[in-house]
Each structure stands twice: as structure tokens, then as C-alpha cells.
Amino acid sequence: MADVVAAQYEKWIYPQPIMDLAEYCGKGMTDGVAPHYLHPLFWPDGEYERREGKINILVAGCGANAAARYAYQHPNAQVTGIDLSEASLNHERYLQEKHQLDNLSLRQLRIEEVSSLGQQFDFIDSVGVLHHLPNPEEGLRQLKTVLKPNGVMGLMLYGLYGRVGVYMLQEFFHRLYLQQTEGDVAVVKETLTQLPKAQLDRLRFTELSYDAGL
């Protein structure tokens, strides 16, 4: 399963690449669990302020943008991003160079191998990743091994009821034996244009606007 996922994200970079972090973050955009604004919840004893934000952050499954975004918005932190996709990491490197993010390091690495980094982290972000692993529980266990005793982990997993419309469409496309080809992506796009408006309104994910999201 991991090899299939890796091949998909090599072909289609995900999420949609951000070209300028200053412009993106200037619109008030940030990560949903970012310590720079949730630290009072994560460390109510004031540890984050005492350390002036000098924490060690791991972005596990960073995709095309997340590690660079964390480094940009947490300039005093040391940020490590890992991902299976070299194509995604290359875009992270583009952002790193563009914004001179000296506090960012990037590695092509599986979550199951995270202990090979030889580091312990104050904060771990893993959004929309663990459920793609062959054994999500093992992935979570490995992340826990590199989390400091007073560390915080921010996770997002797909929820059944919030994505029921997506799962129905996925089942339909599986029955059509669609594969990860440009032609089959075109079939998906055409199908979406034929859905009733009420159904489309329940599928208003930004991912539907570009091929990698589909």
C-alpha cells in the first residue's frame, strides 16, 4: 500500500503547491494545530513562551508545503519534514530556498523509520497521513517513540461521516476499475460535473479543484 501511495504522490504533487509563503500566510492562513497560536492550549504552564518558541517540530508526511510553512511561521523552531514523495520534497526545497528557511531540514523517509532521525520532538504534526499506512497503529507507535515526555502530537484522520459522500464516489469509481491515469482522472472530472447541485455542495473540498486532489 505504501508503494502505491508513494507512486501516486510522485506523479501528482499534493497538496496544491504554494508558490509564495509570504503571500499565503499574509492572508491569515496557518496550520490547524500550529503551536504559534495554540501553545496556550498545548503548554498551559507557559513553557512555549519561556523557550521563546525554540522547539523541535516534526512534520510527518509534510507533502509539498507543510514543513516549509511550519518553518516560516515558527522562525525560532527547528523543523524537520519527512515524506515518501521526492517530488513533494523538491517543492519544499523550493520554498526553503525562496524564503531562506535555515531552520528547516527535509528527508525522504517513511514514518515507520522515523526513529532513524535520532531526534526527539516537542511537537509532531501528522495530518491526513496515518490512515494511508499499511499499519496505522504501528505508524502512531513509531511517532510516539520520538515525542518528548511533555510533547504534543497533532493528528488528523479521515472521519467516516464527514466524508460519506466521498466514500460513495470512491466505491463507484472502484467498480468502474478506474486507475491512476490521466484518462481516468478525466472520467472523474466529467462525472463530478454531472452530480446534482445538492450532492456537489456536500463535496466542497478544495481538493476537487485540481488533479492531485482528485
Feature roles, as predicted:
Residues 137-151:
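A short glycine-rich, Lys/Arg-flanked "PGG" loop and its adjoining helix->strand segment in the class I
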Residues 122-137, 153, 159:
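A short SAM/SAH-binding and catalytic strip from SAM-dependent methyltransferases
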Residues 85-87:
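Conserved SAM/SAH-binding beta-strand->alpha-helix loop
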Residues 112-124:
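A short acidic, Gly/Pro-enriched loop at the edge of an enzyme's catalytic core
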Residues 11-55, 69:
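Conserved alpha-helix/loop element of class I SAM-dependent methyltransferases that forms part
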Residues 63-76:
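Conserved SAM-binding loop of SAM-dependent methyltransferases across substrates and taxa
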Residues 98-113:
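Conserved SAM-binding strand-loop segment of SAM-dependent methyltransferases
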Residues 152-206:
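Conserved class I S-adenosyl-L-methionine
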